[in-house]
């Protein structure tokens, strides 16, 4: 017998108690100095076991984290005084454990890491720390795992940031930070789109009318550049405040000379390959902006109402009119249009050759039936009230619908195919021109209208295509302001979208050509900046022909990874059906199209020499040179003697050509970057915008896509799924989310990490919601996550890596905890790789906040606080806690980097990477290496622990019953009885109840003072138990009983034990606490620092 135990030989009761203590697992470990931290420490050996394949059942519990939100294991019912020592919790009769004489022997948590985030001050402090130490560059430069390039789509430099910007930039930052932890060299160059109408309008709106009149192109450009640069600076500071890491000192701006030169180069390459041409054809035209627009510059708001009409044109003859001779001169072609103002430009009527058409006699008009139908205002034309005989040609299938629409009886007189009408002639309803009937395409259907289409090649894409086929005149009597020109005769000077439209309808009615006028609600294109309607108008423009490389583009699309996968369908449909791209704009603020025009013939001069010369000038002087330099200076040497014969073009390039050239201006020019990029990530609207313009320019010039993967996100809506609008008062401002508003109660300052947590929580592949309630929820989750990390820090205040307990020596509960952790990390890594951040959020929330806090942390408090500072069970628990802290920090760091860094800066122990390198900042850590030994936790034990945790939940239910009946207060006042007919389960439970390793005992897992496993159900014993319960587990019932715990309450750990009173020097202690006190006598009281609950 050792001298330690011999000292109790004179007291048999004390000797017996000490014999029990001797057999316990709470042995004292000798302390080790960590002043000289070695590379191969015990913790290093413990952590670094190598990458492994997944063992059987390795995902058993992780699936419950990530896919079964209401079925988390280890989730217990609510209990008061849950832990063995709850220093800051309530005790009966005002008792506080730390007020006793043994308070200095209790290892309470200590940390300088506060519960409150103080984001307003702490986050900027951390950002300053990162910036001063160039952490982003430092980590990227030191990584050696290859490069990763997420190419930034440039936002417009024309206003404050909104939640869409926040969603976009934070998603990018999460990806970049994850790749840093994966040992990649991350190159992220932020960009801004600085040209175009949006910025030009902002400048013009800020000027007085008189100042606008005096603006020269160069003065306007100077003001636009100044505005754009100022906005870039403001937006950049906001992005930094979001916690976004980027090369902020070297962003790319589309107004930079080197970028503009690269754009000119792309244009030149396309032109030299024959993909750029100039022609007169209908394009989207904005009268409010006085410029052509691309498809990506249009929007289709709800609620647009057009004035649609049914009109008739008098048939006068033609190739096959013999079959219609009997109806002449009272036969007409009936057409329907939603743009009556295009009637002056009518050049033909198109039919579908394969459809059946009928001559119908119009009879029995009833004015009472023509007022209002289905909330659509209908006004009949005078021709319907005319008593003369009237025959019209319409598609046969539409006769019933037109009868109802017009309020008439239509009697079919003759039926024939549309092909029979080709080359028939009719009289133009306004200027009496002789016009043909032509065969159109599949766009002519019987879904609406009359089956005959009014065709104006100068005002529609399909009409234009039909006009080319038949050589129809390209008439477009509309000017830049959207007003009729002199070519429109009596309508000249009238706005086609206003009084001009009304005037045309009135003229048709007065001349007996209007059958019906009707209000028609439909999608109609608006200028996305001025929010006003656009028109189709034929003008001289520069186009990029897509047809020459459409097949190559479609092939490239199929070789790109699209997230979500269905996005490939959208961009494929848009690309396969898109018309030629109108790339010229009639604005001043942009990159010029480098074309010179002959003064007399207007023929353009643009070849390899002229383009390269202009590119060279712009690369040095910027695109302003086009406006201030003479034609002679802008032309190459060999053309200067002809300079007087040419003038500079005034068109600028579409801003989508600007941003669509970024792969050339950035990826192809910046050191450290390469083409193609790994990822493009933008909103879903960019399928017809940046994704497509980048793809087209790249395929046309390089023959391949500029990206390997494309990720798209939805729009940000309010909590009710409504679009945000100032008028509705539902706008969420990212600045106010971070910094708070004037009323801190209504608009609290949440900080950037709460906003980032929200970004990770939503399934961004669709539209996402945000609002006050959602932000409060995110703040609550953040607070709980912070509390979990604070618990870990506090309980590792005296931890050193040399204290690590080898895996094989750990209690089973600790080995199980590491098995769970490894599967969580493995699952999270898979989610990061697949960009499924919302699943990561779910896993982190359930694992750290629910399962760790409610199970492992709950039962760990006993051995952490009272097991003895250097005891085996405390050190084994700290081994697990330190591993959890190091892993959790790394998996959450991409999402909440400020929190992760704040924790790291408060780390109470020194830690080095496996290669021996120090980690001054959290992102200097490497991603956790999967540990084969931890993942190989035996499958049968995995299943047993699942059953045990379910049993724990049922035990808590019975404890709650006992508590409600006032039999117990704390669960430590209880003794639990168990019985199951499952012999294997019973043996396992009995083994645990008698475990020498006290950490694995049932009473510690249930947080009760005693647990007894019954081999049989004796009536006498069962009747003495006050509260019982049972549940079905498999094919067997498990019986649970609860009674008052035996023995007295230990003053130090609050467990009930028959040993209390056995030690004369310490009569209020149980045997375990007595052994700890004897081995580690209490020191004089020292004030605890930042004690945790």
Curated annotation (Swiss-Prot):
Family classification: Belongs to the class-I aminoacyl-tRNA synthetase family.
Q: Which domain of life, per UniProt?
A: Eukaryota
Q: Where is this motif: 'KMSKS' region?
A: 723-727
Per UniProt, Zn(2+) binds at 1050, 1053, 1070, 1073
Could you identify this protein by its name? Isoleucine--tRNA ligase, chloroplastic/mitochondrial
- Reaction(s) catalyzed by this protein? tRNA(Ile) + L-isoleucine + ATP = L-isoleucyl-tRNA(Ile) + AMP + diphosphate
Motif residue range(s): 'HIGH' region: 155-165
Per UniProt, what is one Pfam family of this protein? zf-FPG_IleRS
Q: What happens when the gene is disrupted?
A: Lethal. In heterozygous plants, aborted ovules.
**Key words, A-Z:** Aminoacyl-tRNA synthetase, ATP-binding, Chloroplast, Ligase, Metal-binding, Mitochondrion, Nucleotide-binding, Plastid, Protein biosynthesis, Transit peptide, Zinc
Q: Indicate, by first and last residue, each region the UniProt record lists as having compositional bias (Basic and acidic residues).
A: 90-103
Cellular component per GO?
chloroplast; chloroplast stroma; mitochondrion
């Amino acid at each position: 017998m050792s001298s330690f135990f011999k000292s109790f030989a004179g007291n048999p009761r004390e000797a017996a108690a000490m014999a029990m203590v001797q057999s316990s697992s709470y042995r004292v470990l000798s302390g080790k100095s960590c002043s000289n931290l070695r590379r191969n420490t015990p913790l290093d050996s413990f952590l670094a076991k190598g990458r492994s394949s997944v063992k059987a059942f390795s995902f058993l519990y992780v699936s419950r984290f990530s896919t079964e939100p209401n079925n988390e294991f280890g989730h217990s019912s609510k209990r008061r005084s849950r832990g063995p020592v709850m220093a800051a919790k309530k005790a009966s009769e005002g008792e506080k454990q730390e007020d006793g004489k043994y308070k200095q022997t209790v290892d309470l948590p200590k940390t300088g890491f506060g519960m409150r985030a103080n984001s307003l001050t702490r986050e900027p402090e951390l950002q300053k720390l990162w910036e001063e130490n160039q952490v982003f560059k430092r980590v990227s430069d030191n990584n050696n795992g290859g490069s990763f390039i997420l190419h930034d789509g440039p936002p417009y430099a024309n206003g404050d940031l909104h939640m869409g910007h926040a969603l976009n930039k934070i998603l990018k930052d999460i990806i970049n930070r994850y790749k840093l932890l994966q040992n990649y060299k991350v190159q992220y160059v932020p960009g801004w789109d600085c040209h175009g109408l949006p910025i030009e309008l902002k400048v013009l709106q800020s000027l007085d009318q008189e100042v606008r009149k005096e603006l020269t192109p160069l003065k306007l450009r100077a003001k636009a550049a100044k505005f754009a640069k100022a906005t870039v600076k403001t937006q950049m500071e906001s992005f930094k405040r979001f916690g976004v890491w980027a090369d902020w000192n070297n962003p790319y701006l589309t107004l930079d000379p080197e970028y503009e030169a690269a754009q000119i180069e792309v244009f030149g390459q396309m032109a030299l390959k024959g993909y750029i041409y100039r022609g007169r054809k209908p394009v989207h035209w904005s009268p409010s902006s006085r410029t052509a627009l691309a498809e990506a510059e249009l929007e289709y708001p709800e609620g647009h109402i057009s004035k649609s009409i049914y009109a008739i044109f008098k048939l006068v003859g033609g190739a096959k009119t013999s079959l219609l001779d009997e109806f002449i001169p009272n036969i007409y072609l009936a057409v329907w249009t939603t743009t009556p103002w295009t009637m002056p430009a009518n050049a033909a009527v198109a039919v579908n050759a394969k459809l059946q058409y009928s001559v119908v006699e119009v009879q029995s008009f009833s004015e009472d039936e023509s007022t209002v139908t289905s909330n659509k205002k209908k006004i009949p034309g005078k021709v319907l009230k005319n008593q003369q005989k009237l025959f019209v040609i319409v598609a046969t299938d539409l006769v019933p619908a037109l009868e109802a629409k017009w309020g008439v009886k239509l009697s079919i007189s003759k039926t024939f195919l549309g092909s029979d009408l080709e080359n028939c002639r009719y009289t133009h309803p306004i200027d009496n021109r002789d016009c043909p009937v032509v065969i159109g395409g599949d766009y002519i259907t019987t879904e609406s209208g009359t089956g005959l289409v009014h065709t104006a090649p100068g005002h529609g894409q399909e009409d234009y295509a039909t006009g080319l086929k038949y050589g129809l005149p390209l008439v477009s009597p509309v000017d830049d302001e959207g007003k009729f020109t002199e070519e429109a005769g009596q309508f000249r000077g009238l706005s086609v979208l206003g009084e001009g439209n009304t005037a045309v309808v009135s003229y048709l009615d007065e001349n007996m050509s209007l059958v019906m006028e009707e209000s028609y609600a439909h999608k109609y294109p608006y200028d996305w900046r001025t929010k006003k309607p656009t028109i189709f108008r034929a003008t001289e423009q520069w186009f990029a022909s897509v047809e020459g490389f459409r097949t190559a583009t479609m092939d490239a699309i199929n070789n790109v990874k699209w997230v979500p996968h269905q996005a490939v369908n959208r961009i494929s449909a848009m690309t396969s059906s898109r018309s030629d791209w109108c790339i010229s704009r009639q604005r001043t603020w942009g990159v010029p199209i480098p074309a010179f025009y002959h003064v007399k013939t207007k023929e353009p001069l643009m070849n390899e020499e002229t383009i390269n010369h202009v590119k060279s000038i712009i690369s040095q002087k910027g695109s302003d040179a086009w406006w201030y330099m003479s034609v002679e200076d802008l032309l190459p040497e060999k053309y200067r003697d002809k300079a007087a014969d040419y003038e500079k073009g005034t068109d600028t390039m579409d801003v989508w050509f600007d941003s669509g050239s970024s792969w050339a201006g950035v990826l192809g020019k910046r050191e450290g970057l390469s083409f193609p990029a790994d990822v493009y990530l933008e909103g879903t609207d960019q399928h017809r915008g940046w994704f497509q313009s980048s793809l087209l320019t790249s395929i046309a010039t390089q023959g391949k896509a500029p990206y390997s993967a494309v990720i798209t996100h939805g729009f940000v809506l309010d909590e009710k799924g409504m679009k945000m609008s100032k008028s509705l008062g539902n706008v969420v401002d990212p600045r106010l989310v971070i910094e708070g508003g004037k009323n801190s109660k209504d608009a609290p300052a949440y900080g950037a990490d709460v906003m980032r947590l929200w970004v990770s929580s939503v399934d961004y592949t669709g539209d996402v919601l945000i609002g006050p309630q959602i932000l409060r929820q995110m703040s609550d989750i953040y607070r709980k996550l912070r509390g979990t990390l604070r618990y870990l820090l506090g309980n590792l205040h005296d931890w050193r890596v040399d204290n690590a307990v080898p895996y094989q020596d750990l209690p089973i509960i600790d080995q199980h905890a590491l098995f769970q952790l490894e599967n969580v990390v493995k699952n999270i890594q898979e989610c990061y790789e697949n960009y499924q951040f919302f699943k990561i959020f779910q896993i982190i929330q359930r694992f750290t906040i629910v399962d760790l806090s409610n199970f492992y942390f709950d039962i760990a408090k006993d051995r952490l606080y009272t097991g003895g500072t250097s005891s085996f069970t405390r050190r084994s628990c700290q081994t697990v806690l330190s591993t959890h802290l190091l892993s959790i920090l790394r998996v959450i760091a991409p999402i909440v980097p400020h929190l992760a860094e704040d924790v790291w800066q408060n780390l109470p122990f020194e830690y080095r990477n496996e290669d021996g390198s120090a980690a001054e900042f959290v992102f200097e850590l490497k991603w956790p290496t999967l540990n084969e030994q931890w993942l190989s936790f035996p499958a049968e034990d995995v299943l047993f622990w699942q059953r045990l945790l379910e049993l724990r939940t049922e035990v808590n239910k019975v404890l709650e019953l006992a508590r409600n009946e006032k039999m117990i207060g704390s669960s430590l006042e209880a003794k639990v009885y168990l019985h199951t007919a499952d012999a294997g389960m019973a043996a396992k439970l009995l083994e645990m109840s008698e475990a020498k390793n006290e950490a694995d005992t049932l009473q510690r897992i249930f947080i009760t003072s005693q647990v007894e496993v019954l081999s049989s159900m004796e009536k006498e014993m069962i009747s003495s138990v006050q509260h019982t319960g049972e549940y079905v587990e498999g094919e067997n019932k498990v019986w649970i009983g609860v009674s008052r715990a035996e023995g007295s309450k230990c003053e130090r750990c609050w467990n009930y034990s028959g040993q209390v009173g056995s030690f004369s020097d310490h009569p209020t202690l149980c045997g375990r606490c007595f052994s700890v006190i004897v081995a580690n006598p209490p020191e004089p009281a020292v004030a605890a620092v930042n004690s945790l609950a």
